């Protein structure tokens, strides 16, 4: 991806509120550049705290302007700790060289653990441990219906 690999792009900052898996973050790991992201939601499956900067925060009510069929009354969003964000941005800017190795580690971890082959291995393990046998087709044997004889009209 040209944007991710542009020489002026030094890291990815994602302040996602917890909308899902975080595929753009997973894709970005392959640039081997540092990542600053919220420490909440699906992306923490592949972003490791010792390899990325995961920001603290709290769960807060969603903004009333976004309520719809998906975001309903009582739904929560992750609100990042603004002070931690500011500190992390400054630290990344001042000490960028300290984060380069972590970005490379994160990229290698994602590449080794989040591939099609790894997914097949995990699904196979789950199926082998939980499915005793596959369903088999059996002949259908319905009882013969005894219908009343109807008179012609």
Model region roles, listed by residue range:
Residues 1-7:
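Short alpha-helical donor nucleotide-sugar binding micro-motif in glycosyltransferases
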Residues 10, 32, 39:
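A short alpha->beta transition loop at the rim of the catalytic pocket in nucleotide-sugar-dependent
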Residues 17:
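Aromatic "clamp/platform" in nucleotide-sugar-dependent glycosyltransferases that forms part
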Residues 20-22, 115:
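Active-site helix-initiating loop/hinge in glycosyltransferases
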Residues 22-27, 35, 42-47:
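A short, glycine- and acidic-residue-rich donor-binding loop in the catalytic cores
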Residues 79-80, 84, 94-125:
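A charged, aromatic-enriched C-terminal amphipathic alpha-helix characteristic of glycosyltransferases
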Residues 95, 116-152:
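C-terminal alpha-helical cap of glycosyltransferases
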């Amino acid at each position: 991806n040209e944007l991710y690999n542009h020489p002026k792009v030094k890291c990815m900052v994602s302040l996602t509120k917890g909308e899902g898996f975080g595929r753009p973050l997973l894709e970005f790991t392959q640039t081997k550049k540092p990542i600053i992201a919220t420490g909440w939601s699906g992306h923490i499956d592949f972003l490791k705290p010792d390899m990325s900067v995961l920001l603290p925060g709290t769960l807060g009510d969603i903004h009333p302007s976004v309520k719809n069929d998906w975001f309903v009354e009582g739904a929560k969003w992750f609100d990042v700790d603004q002070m931690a964000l500011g500190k992390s941005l400054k630290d990344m800017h001042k000490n960028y060289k300290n984060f380069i190795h972590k970005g490379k580690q994160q990229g290698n971890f994602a590449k080794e653990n989040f591939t099609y082959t790894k997914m097949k291995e995990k699904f196979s393990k789950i199926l082998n441990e939980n499915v005793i046998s596959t369903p088999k087709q059996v002949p259908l044997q319905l009882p013969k219906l005894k219908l009343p004889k109807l008179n012609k009209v």
